[in-house]
Amino acid sequence: MRILRLSGAVLLVAEALLMIHPVLLVANFFTGAGVLGKGLFYVRVPDVIGQGVGYLILPKVAVLLVQAAIGVATSARGIGALVLQPFVLGPALVPFLRPMLLVAPVVLLLVVVATVGVLLALIGHTPRQRTRHRRWWLLAVYAVGLTALVVVNGRSTTFPIQPLDRFAAAGTGSAPTSKNLPAADTAQNPAMAANPFNSIHNDSWATDSYDLPAPAPGGEVDTLFTGGDCATITFDSRGRLITLCSTLAQVVGYVIDPATLEVITSRQVGTRSPSLTDFSGGGYFVLDDQDRIVFPARGGVLRVLSSMDLREVDSVDVSATLAPDEQVTSVLPDWQGRYWYVGSLGTVGVVGEEGPKALNLQGEDIENSFAVARDGVFVVTGAALYRLEAVGNGPPREVWRTAYDGGQERKPGQTSRASGTTPTLFADWGVAITDNADPQMNVVVADRRTGRVVCEVPVFRSGASATENSLIAIDDTLVVENNYGYAPAITATMAGRSTEPGMAAITAVDGECSPAWSNDSVVVPSLVSKATTKQGLVLTYTKPPTTNGVDAWYFTAVDVRTGEQVWTQLAGTGVSFNNHYAAAYLSPQGDLFVGTLSGIAVLRP
């Protein structure tokens, strides 16, 4: 009987260690306590409270398993331990949770089977009686520690306290000494706020580039907790930071002082479906020439908000032009101030004097935003790249359609089986996307006047190439990153794991293309990276794999001329610092901002 009890206790402790990486268990306990505290006392958003509770489930199960092991080792029958077994199986059976495991799922399954067998034998050999062992001290310590962390975190506006930062490298490299590149000549859309501060891709050409100085390593890192992913960050004419942050169920607008991260005002402005890969409802928004926020709310309504108090000042209902169950993905104005919008099921519309008019692109899904030039709009669907134009007060007219290789499947890291890029315009002739070809993705460059494909350049390792983010256009260079492996979203980068490495560049000059460089070590799970002509840097956000299980995220600079990594600086550790498809941004003062699952992180100059 003694051997049976010791075997059961050992197996229960083994389950506690194997079902979630021990380092991740600690990280999630601190993250969960922090998010719960901020949800209760700071942002006061119900589903943020739910997120905090979610992070705490597996740490709580681990504590209960150890508590059960102590009981089984003494005199308990093991019924409570048996009840815990379905929770232990969760990480092995649920794909979203598998990356949290310390071992392969089959190993945990075998341990659970053995544990259940021992517990059943123990229950059968132990008579029913009132147990007199005292093991509740462990649960009491857990509860006291959790309560203390909840209260302490609830009193601050920063990300949750995370003690594992000390086990991550601080960074590498130093400030660059390279010369500046020629300043960008990107057209200013007169209906939008000033470039490059008006949208997720900086301008209506979606160049993702700046002519601003970037911070150097060694600067201070600040954070602001919002409880949601702040995918798009803009700056108005007063220099204030304007953003929409999406929790699982809500979209909350923020007006923030970028120098202090003090929240000037905030307000819930919409709702969204609980999805990790659906960006409709507020993932994309644009700041117009009057400093107003324009975004597609759920239900097919284009909402216009004042950036003074985040109250609605105008709206356009375009739901009648959408297919059943279709949501608007993104909205941008053209040079005449007309709102263009795209829907997830292939609708492209424009709001003219007679209201919204639209056409449907054969039901082809549209998962990303679009680009707007003076004389046309460029949209990529799941099957083709389009140029469209407005015709009077009628629906948009298709100017040309260029099919691309959409591949055979949705690759890990993508939100759909198709191109993951918003079209990028450059120079006075080009438009670029990536395809989804198997086994190797290509950068596809077309003549934006005719749609003729000028070149297709394969990038990254065969069988491990995909991107879900727009190309960067800077000087004569197009920069692309590899996001292959960011699946399941969020948990794929837990427990020291990360995605496939890769960043590459091609030159595109006078209608001809050639590979420029390829970096096979930088790891960018999902950031919308940016570049600046000042010292010629790509500014990105990396998460290299680690052997100790600490999930460290880094602000990173890469030389746009050579592809060499110039410097990195630790942003922080844990899931709060996961940007999850959000972008990087430079402020007018040279601060580097990144939207994350918990809010905003910034590297100061």
Regions found by a protein language model. Give the residues of each.
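Sequence/structural signature of beta-propeller modules
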Residues: 2-266, 290, 605
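Repeated scaffold domains used in trafficking and secretory/extracellular systems
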Residues: 226-235, 271-287, 321-336, 363-374, ...
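Loop/turn-rich, solvent-exposed surfaces of beta-rich toroidal or solenoidal domains
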Residues: 245, 430-433, 469-575
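Structural motif
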Residues: 248-257, 299-306, 345-352, 383-389, ...
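Surface-exposed loop and turn segments in beta-propeller and other repeat-based domains
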Residues: 267-277, 317-324, 397-416, 456-464, ...
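Asp-box/WD-like beta-propeller blade repeats and closely related beta-sheet repeat scaffolds
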Residues: 268-282, 296-338, 342-372, 405-414
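Blade-level signature of beta-propeller repeat domains, shared across WD40, Kelch, NHL, RCC1
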Residues: 578-605
